[in-house]
A protein has these predicted regions:
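C-terminal motif of bacterial Sec signal peptides marking the signal peptidase cleavage site
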Residues: 16-19
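Short beta-strand edge/turn micro-motifs at domain boundaries
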Residues: 183-190, 405-407, 417-452
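Beta-strand residues in well-ordered beta-sheet regions across diverse protein folds
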Residues: 160, 256, 407-409, 446
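Compositionally biased intrinsically disordered regions enriched in Thr/Gly
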Residues: 21-295
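Surface-exposed, charged secondary-structure patches
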Residues: 149-154, 371-417
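Core segments of small alpha/beta cavity-forming domains
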Residues: 71, 94-104, 292-380
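Positively charged n-region of N-terminal signal peptides that target proteins for export
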Residues: 1-9
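Hydrophobic/aromatic beta-strand elements that line small-molecule binding cavities or substrate pockets
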Residues: 144-150, 177-180, 392-397, 422, ...
Length: 452
C-alpha cells in the first residue's frame, strides 16, 4: 500500500510539472505552422496566335503573343491558392506579387490586342483598295510580342523579348520589351525609380543612370561604333530612362536601344552589357539584396567607388556648388563642396574610412586639396584628365580568408602617325595590387596605387 501511494504521488507530480511547462489557453486555437511559399514561373504562358482574313481567305493580319506567368507553390510543391472565407483573409505577399506580375503581362496582351484591331482596320482598307494584280504581292500586317527570356534572382525577376509590327511597309518595326520585377514588393523597377534611391555612389554625387551612361559610352568608344551612330547619339544615352530598355541577367544589367534611336534602323537594336562591378554600388541596398551577385564583383565595384574618392585628391574635382563663392587658402582658390552632409574635414575623413584604411585616408587628406571654412568644406580645382596611354584594364580578386587583393593588369598604347590612331604597345603589361579587408561584404583598401 505504501509503495502504491508513492507511485501515485510520483505520477501526480510529473503531471503537474508537465502542466506548468506548457501553458495552453483553451479559448485560442492552435496557430498552424506557416508554410514556406515560393514564386515560380508557370509552364503555361499567356499566349495567343490568330489570323484575321479577308472574305476571299487572304490573311490580312497575324497577331501573336507569348508572355510568362508567375504562380506560388507550397513546400509540398503544390500550387498555392488562398483559403475560401467569408471574412477578410490576409493574402501572402508572394501571392500578391504573382498577381501583380501577371496583371502587367495581361495589360501588355490587352494593349497588343487593341493595337492589332486598329491594324486590322487599316489592313482591310488597304487590301480593299488594291486591284487583282496588286493583291498578288500582298504581304500581311503583323502584331507580335514574344517574351521568351527569363532571369530569376533571389528577390527579382527580369523578363525580356522582342516586339514586331508591320503595317504594310517595306519592312516591319522591331522593338525590345523588358520588365524587371521586385518579388518582395510586387513592384516593377524603373531607371528613374532606382535613380531616386540613396546609394553608396549617390553619396559621392554619382547617379546610377550617369554611371550606366558612361559605361555605354566607354563601350562605344572601345569598339569604334560612334562613326555609325547619329551625331547626337550621346544625348539619348545620357537620358537612358526615356530612351532605353533594361533588364538584369546573371552577369549584370543590359541596356538596349531600339532601332533608329541612336543608330540607323538597318543597324538594328543596340545592346550594351554592363557587369555588376561597374554599377553595383550605385544601387540602393534594397535592390542589392534582391540580386545574386558574386562577391568578386562586389569587391571590384568597391574599387570603382574608391577610385572616385581617390580622383578627388589626384585627378579631378568633387561635386561643387557653382553658385557659392570661392575662398582663398594657402595661396589658392577653393570651391564649396556639394556632398550633402559632408561639410567638414572630419566628415570627409569618416567617409574615406568607409572605403580605405585610416592611414590611407590621412595620406590623401595631407595633400591639402580640401579645406574647411566657416562650417563648410571646400576643394581645390584639380581637373587634369586621365592617362590616355592606358589601353586596357582587367581585374582579378585573390582571396586570403576574409581579406584579399585586387590584381589590376593594364596595357599601354601609343600614337601612330601612319595610322592616325593609337596602337597597342606589345609587352606593356603592368600589374598593380590593391590589398583589402572586408566589412559587411565590402572592401576597405589599405593601398590604392591607381595608375590613373
Amino acid at each position: 500500500m505504501k509503495k502504491l501511494l508513492s507511485t501515485l504521488l510520483a505520477l501526480s507530480l510529473a503531471l503537474s510539472l508537465g502542466a506548468c511547462a506548457v501553458k495552453v489557453d483553451p479559448s485560442e486555437p492552435d496557430e498552424p505552422a506557416k508554410d514556406e511559399l515560393r514564386i515560380v514561373f508557370t509552364e503555361e504562358h499567356l499566349t495567343k496566335e490568330a489570323e484575321y482574313k479577308a472574305d476571299d481567305g487572304t490573311v490580312l493580319l497575324i497577331e501573336k503573343y507569348d508572355l510568362p506567368q508567375l504562380e506560388v507553390r507550397t513546400s509540398a510543391d503544390e500550387v498555392y491558392t488562398p483559403p475560401v472565407s467569408n471574412t477578410v483573409v490576409d493574402v501572402p505577399q508572394e501571392y500578391a506579387a504573382a498577381l501583380a506580375f501577371n496583371a502587367e503581362m495581361q495589360h501588355a496582351a490587352d494593349a497588343l490586342d487593341a493595337s492589332a484591331q486598329e491594324a486590322l482596320t487599316m489592313a482591310r482598307e488597304h487590301y480593299a483598295g488594291l486591284d487583282e494584280e496588286q493583291r498578288a504581292y500582298w504581304a500581311n500586317y503583323a502584331e507580335e510580342l514574344i517574351v521568351d527570356s527569363i532571369c530569376q534572382h533571389s528577390g527579382l525577376v527580369s523578363v525580356w523579348g522582342g516586339g514586331y509590327s508591320n503595317y504594310g511597309g517595306a519592312h516591319g518595326w522591331e522593338s525590345i520589351r523588358a520588365w524587371s520585377f521586385d518579388l518582395t514588393t510586387g513592384e516593377f523597377l524603373t531607371l528613374d525609380g532606382l535613380d531616386a534611391q540613396p546609394s553608396t555612389d549617390s553619396a559621392l554625387g554619382e547617379s546610377l543612370t550617369h554611371t550606366l551612361a558612361m559605361a555605354v559610352l566607354e563601350q562605344i568608344d572601345a569598339q569604334g561604333l560612334s562613326e555609325y551612330y547619329f551625331e547626337d547619339y550621346a544625348s539619348y544615352i545620357f537620358d537612358l530612362a526615356a530612351n532605353a530598355s533594361f533588364y538584369f541577367d546573371d552577369k549584370g544589367i543590359v541596356i538596349v536601344f531600339d532601332p533608329a534611336v541612336i543608330a540607323p534602323y538597318a543597324a538594328s537594336a543596340q545592346k550594351f552589357e554592363i557587369p555588376y562591378s561597374r554599377f553595383y554600388n550605385a544601387l540602393d541596398s534594397h535592390t542589392q539584396s534582391l540580386l545574386n551577385v558574386l562577391q568578386d564583383e562586389i569587391i571590384i565595384a568597391d574599387y570603382y567607388t574608391t577610385k572616385t574618392l581617390w580622383s578627388w585628391f589626384y585627378q579631378t574635382t568633387p561635386p561643387i556648388d557653382a553658385n557659392a563663392p570661392a575662398v582663398m587658402a594657402n595661396g589658392q582658390s577653393f570651391n564649396r563642396v556639394s556632398l550633402g552632409e559632408i561639410n567638414t574635414l572630419d566628415a570627409l575623413r569618416a567617409l574615406l574610412c568607409e572605403h580605405v584604411s585610416a592611414e590611407l585616408a590621412d595620406e590623401w587628406l595631407a595633400t591639402g586639396h580640401f579645406v574647411e571654412s566657416d562650417g563648410a568644406l571646400y576643394a581645390a580645382w584639380a581637373d587634369r584628365g586621365s592617362d590616355i596611354t592606358i589601353d586596357t584594364e582587367s581585374y582579378l580578386v585573390a582571396w586570403n580568408g576574409d581579406a584579399g587583393e585586387i590584381m589590376q593588369t593594364i596595357t599601354r598604347r601609343e600614337w601612330n602617325d601612319e595610322t592616325g590612331d593609337f596602337v597597342p604597345v606589345p609587352g606593356s603589361e603592368t600589374y598593380y595590387g590593391y590589398p583589402f579587408t572586408t566589412m559587411n561584404r565590402h572592401a576597405v583598401f589599405s593601398a590604392f596605387p591607381c595608375p590613373s
